[in-house]
């Protein structure tokens, strides 16, 4: 537990042939590292959508961990990490970055609960989008927290449940998200492939 209370998730669609992965690793990663060092954010990771195709609406998810929601937009400019850039270099970078990707969506969650069996970031995150009926949120969170007791005896490397807080309303497609973390695809299949009978407690 690194003390994070909020998670920002940005859904990115890359443009083929524009090398957004290189931009991500050489520029935005450096900015994130500086923001972490300065204490503005607590963590930053880029996750590739393994099942994405040309028709998928996103192929990268950028996850930012925050303790203070007011720091979400603080110290974000690329010049914070590369103060030596000239105006022309900055303009060229902004043009290249803009042409290499589209920001499809950006969401903010508060961390309800999580549990990890290891210090390092797992290799695979399986996202489960949940729609919880208004008025049932407390009982739903209580039920999800009950799963935590089973993590140690499962193939999971970690688990989390997040409540969406950037938007509310009955028209939302989801208002919660659970995340199952694994290190190998074979561990994912150990849980996903079998069909289990659900107990009355979790129906």
Whereabouts are the PLM-identified features?
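Short S/T/G/P-rich N-terminal loop/turn motif that feeds into the first structured element of a domain
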Residues: 1-86, 91-203
